[in-house]
Amino acid sequence: MSSDSQRPRVVIAGAGFGGLTATKNLAKAAVDVTLIDAQNHHCFQPLLYQVATAALSPADVAWPIRAILRNQQNARVIMAQVTGVDVEARRVHTTEVDLAYDYLVLATGATHSYFGHDDWAPYAPGLKHISDATEIRRRFLMAFERAEVVEDDAERQRLLTFVIVGGGATGVEMAGAIAEVAQRTLRHDFRHIDPRRSRIILIEAGPRMLPAFPESLSDYAARSLQSMGVEVELGHVVTGCDGRGVTLKDGRRIDAATVIWAAGVVASPAANWIDAGHDRAGRIKVNPDLSVPGRPEIFAIGDTASVTYSDGRPVPGIAPAAKQMGSYAAQVIAARVEGSKPPSPFVYHHAGDLATIGRKSAVVKLGVFQLKGFLGWVFWSVVHIYFLIGIRNRFVVALNWLWSYLTFQRGARLIGVSSR
């Protein structure tokens, strides 16, 4: 980085899709950029569920942030947790150091929302970070190991029952992957249990799964999961969750050793740090240029920002939206530094939606264009490999998928020690 103290200082909090894109798009700007993240790696979240279900290893879906930005001379990386912002002094507080800024980009993302029941978190982990994925992998693989030695039939069935709460893309992909592990990968590996007798239950509070997709594709996904042995429960709300299973609003009790939460998210505390207006999910309400009202030097992007289409619908909290916001915020900052005309107000361009159901089936919607089944899965695979960071990761993931497709085996079935 330049030692010229006159260069504007840009601090970017969060190295997810939005924060990393903003950093890279400021490479040619006359600014000094500091990127802060609690992790030393950028994680490709769309494939985290494959780490959680033993198809991929953590290193296959992550890349060191410093390696990504190695050749960007105006950027440095600080590994720390942001704890607050002094908007008057223009300083960011972290667990390691305080940083002064001229421009601040808040890209701190979101975490799991248990809708007022945070006490459920220890029993129903969500999927946002590498550590979440490895913990879920440990839990669901250990369930089979424990079922192998338990004598009580009821306890064995509880161990072999897996509940996924939430019928969005993550929930659908998790349910399909766990079903494949039980039905295919593990079917010959145990002597006293038959993994194929496992129960995989997907619970969705709404009338259909994958609500972002056309109803025809949602129905196709439901039928595909059911053909894989997944029990699809639509229109059911979880009202209780503990170490023994879940309770539904209709009074039913489902005993399960493994519960996975994919039902909702809430933004980071960033709105509280800067005392900004926010929506019900904690996302900061922003101006058309993604700056914070009353604080033109502060921007919020990705899951940290509440952004809507012209008709009032919220922009989805997905990677493409975060990347577009990150690129746009960088353009605004660069224009201000150069004294040039600012870009037009931010408009999100939605390319489409994708979700995989299993090893050879997916649903895809790109405008009026729709795919499902094997062709959808091929398209889904190509898109995800293309957007992975690092040639090595793309090559390894492609080989793993080919091996899994041909053999039904998963090469990342190591059970680690719990950190929770």
PLM regions: where:
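Rossmann-like dinucleotide-binding core of oxidoreductases
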Residues: R156-F213, E231-E233, P316-A335, S340-P345, ...
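Short hydrophobic core segments
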Residues: A13, L99-T111, H129, V238, ...
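C-terminal, flexible cofactor-proximal segment of oxidoreductases
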Residues: R7, A330-R420
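Beta1-alpha1 glycine-rich phosphate/pyrophosphate-binding loop at the start
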Residues: S2-M79, T83, A169-F213, I260
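FAD-binding core/adjacent interface of flavoenzyme oxidoreductases
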Residues: M1-R7, A75-V163, I260
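A Rossmann-like FAD-binding core segment of flavoenzymes
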Residues: Q73-G84, A179-P288, V292-G294, K341
